[in-house]
Design a protein with these regions (language model features):
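N-terminal, polar/Ser/Thr-rich
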Residues: 8-76, 80-83, 498-504
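Extended, low-hydrophobicity, Ser/Thr/Pro/Gly-biased non-transmembrane segments
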Residues: 29, 38-46, 64, 71, ...
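Hydrophobic helix-coil surface modules that form long, contiguous segments used
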Residues: 59, 189-362, 392
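A surface-exposed beta-strand-loop module
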Residues: 86-87, 92-160, 203-204, 599-615, ...
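Beta-strand-rich binding/interaction modules
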Residues: 88, 98-103, 229, 499, ...
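Zinc-dependent metallopeptidase catalytic helix centered on the HExxH motif
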Residues: 296, 301, 347-409, 466
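Amphipathic alpha-helical substructures
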Residues: 310, 439-530
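Acidic/His/Gly-enriched intrinsically disordered linker/tail segments
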Residues: 387-448, 452, 456, 474-478
Length: 641
């Protein structure tokens, strides 16, 4: 197995050929990019060939200096008139300390930050528009030890991505905590730029040093292993004790890719004309059927509702939990930790937890649309376009499989995790469409918001708006799309009566305090039951620091107070449609819906009576937890007999 393996004296060597060619019109950011990346990579442990013997390649980097000077941030002097004319400074960031670089043009190393692996080179002769410069580089990592994990290269199950290679430009890895910054006389860090920042719109939030690239990789590994990279296998051969694989992508991809190597078994299937494969450790076959089912379900949902799938294959590749408990979606390739799917013991009973081997698979496949077709600019809110919408797809697919009535535990889990995580926020919490990239916002809150929105305006209506949005921005060149673009597409299909949802869900931080106060029922002469419900609904907003307010102006809020109340209760002005539900039991004592309808609520305090055909057991206000309610435990109440 892959548990607790300790590997001594491991190293990885990369021989990389890279060609980037960019043409653009910088003033309007209507750039068209043609970038080619060809990689030759060796994955070795201590029985690898001699390091010198594996260094056989060169790296060529050709940029249009106009793009680099402005859009790619490779020039220290940011004066616009000068930046358009030449490049005289190159910035480079390294992941591994032992990274050796060599340019083919004379330069001086003017800054070497050995703590954060950031160098600045000044060219002795500046690059004019149309000039090119070659870069040769070799990357090594330190060997793993008994107490320190330095390398992602292991004896079985290697996984690393392109962050291991040098990157160009300013990385933006700055101190984020304002109190820490204050100690160094630094101003508060604003993190991501606003969507109005024209420079930031020239980059995706995934990569600042390239746009869409043509990708080809040759990877060597141990003779008994399979090496995998994005693209389609073109050639495989053995040379000495090394096994080689050549992959090539047939369409442009983001500058975002990974390499895997392991002693894999391979499970195969098909979805329409798409080849499906799962590369797994021999003893970890517990949930292959669930993961294969998840791939098919996600491909079905996304291709039906948004746009066609852009590749002819889709692969999941297992890696050891020592690299982390996550999955990551690259073009047609999804590295997937053993820890979150392959070795899970799934409880399919009513009381069981979520089938996360299926759920995570759907989420990662959804990224083939929401990240690899639609990619946001490097601005606030862009992770809503990738993570929130992928989570939304997961919830809708689970709803198709399990039915709407079983969605409460999924929604409540997301709600509770969001509410808990936001209490630990140290910097600021923005509204969803302007989030800073915090996981609890774009995962937990985002999934709730989009699921609720599909419930309010209709799943088909929402998906049609998203499909229209995909058609507009998929695979686009700079300037890249933003959350504002997507929200505008949703606004177009939202009825006037529900316009408040746009403000509550996307533009502000809005929370509810809904609760059932009292309920009782009585049997009528005709055999039906009258259910009386007293309940309260209120909502408020938070600013980025968590301060509560009830409206932009005094008249925007409403109050409720009785004679025996010391203080009134407040709410933002209400014209809200909220689910009211009444529930009974079937012959097996399982919950069934007797009544579920959205009622328009305009007051904090409410009393209603509803007639149902069967004996009621429980009532609920927003009973399925679709809204962001600060205490969902009081949304339901057993009926007083």
């Amino acid at each position: 197995g892959c548990f607790g393996i300790t590997i001594l004296m491991l190293a990885v060597y990369y021989i990389i050929h890279v060609l980037f060619i960019t043409e653009s019109y910088i003033e309007t950011f209507t750039a068209s990019a043609q970038n080619t990346a060809v990689y030759s990579t060796s994955i070795c442990n201590n029985d690898c060939i001699e390091p010198g013997a594996s260094i056989t390649g060169a790296n060529k980097v050709e940029y249009d200096p106009v793009i680099l000077a402005n859009k790619k941030s490779l020039v220290v002097n940011r004066l616009t008139d000068r930046a358009k004319d030449l490049i005289n400074v190159i910035k480079m960031t390294f992941y591994y300390t032992d990274t050796q670089t060599l340019f083919n043009k004379e330069n001086d190393l003017v800054l070497e930050d050995i703590l954060y692996n950031f160098d600045i080179y000044k060219l002795k002769q500046a690059l004019n528009p149309g000039d090119s410069i070659n870069l040769f580089f070799t990357v090594k990592n330190k060997p793993n030890t008994m107490i320190r994990n330095n390398s992602s290269v292991v004896s079985n199950g290697t996984f690393f991505n392109n962050s291991a290679f040098p990157s160009f430009g300013y990385s933006g890895r700055e101190l984020t905590d304002d109190k820490t910054r204050e100690k160094y006389d630094l101003p508060p860090n604003k993190l991501k730029p606003f969507p109005s920042d024209s420079t930031a719109l020239g980059n995706t939030y995934i990569s600042k040093d390239a746009d869409w690239i043509d990708f080809e990789a040759t990877v060597s590994t141990s003779k008994d292993q399979i090496a995998i990279a994005p693209g389609y296998l073109q050639k495989e051969w053995i040379e000495g004790d090394r096994r080689y694989f050549n992959y090539k992508m047939d369409s442009k991809i983001l500058n975002f890719y990974a390499f895997n190597s392991g002693k894999y078994e391979v499970a195969k299937d098909k979805w329409n004309d798409v080849n499906l494969e799962i590369y797994y450790h021999k003893d970890h076959d517990y949930n292959l059927d669930r993961m294969m089912k998840g791939m098919k379900a996600a491909l079905d949902y996304c291709s039906t509702n948004f746009s066609p799938y852009q590749h002819k294959q889709l692969r999941i590749i297992e890696f050891p939990r020592t690299a982390g408990g996550f999955a990551q979606s690259f073009p047609n390739t999804v590295p997937f930790s053993e820890d979150i799917g392959f070795i899970a013991k799934v409880d399919d009973s009513e009381e069981g937890g979520n089938d996360y081997s299926f759920f995570v698979t759907v989420h990662e496949v959804a990224h083939q649309w929401w990240a690899h077709q639609v990619i946001g600019a490097d601005v606030l809110g862009s992770t809503m376009l990738s993570e929130s919408l992928s989570e939304y797809v997961s919830l809708k697919v689970i709803e198709q499989v399990n039915g709407k009535k079983k969605m409460r535990k999924f929604l409540k889990r997301s709600l509770d995790e969001y509410l808990t995580s936001r209490t630990f926020e140290r910097k600021r919490e923005n509204a969803l469409m302007y989030n800073d990239g915090q996981g609890y916002i774009h995962y937990q809150k985002g999934s709730l918001i989009f699921y609720a929105l599909s419930d309010y305006i209709g799943e088909k209506t929402l998906n049609n708006a998203l499909s229209k949005y995909v058609k507009k921005v998929a695979f686009q060149e700079p300037p890249y799309t933003t959350s504002i673009d997507m929200v505008n597409h949703v606004k177009e299909v939202t009825p006037d009566s529900l316009n408040y949802l746009i403000k509550d869900m996307f533009e502000t931080i809005t929370l509810y305090q809904n609760r059932v106060v009292e309920t009782k029922s009585k049997k009528l002469d005709n055999g039906k039951y009258q259910v009386d419900i007293e309940f309260k609904v209120s909502k408020y907003r938070n600013n980025e620091k968590g301060r509560i307010f009830y409206g932009e102006e005094e008249r925007d809020s409403i109050t409720y107070q009785t004679d025996d109340m010391k203080k009134p209760e407040y709410s933002v002005f209400l014209e809200d449609y909220i689910d009211v539900g009444i529930f009974g039991e079937d012959n097996d004592e399982k919950e069934i819906e007797l009544y579920l309808k959205k009622l328009k609520i305009s007051s904090i305090h409410n009393k209603i009576s509803i007639i149902v055909d069967q004996e009621p057991i429980e009532v609920g206000i927003d009973p399925y937890n679709k809204l962001i309610d600060t205490n969902s435990e009081d949304n339901r109440m057993k009926i007083e007999k």
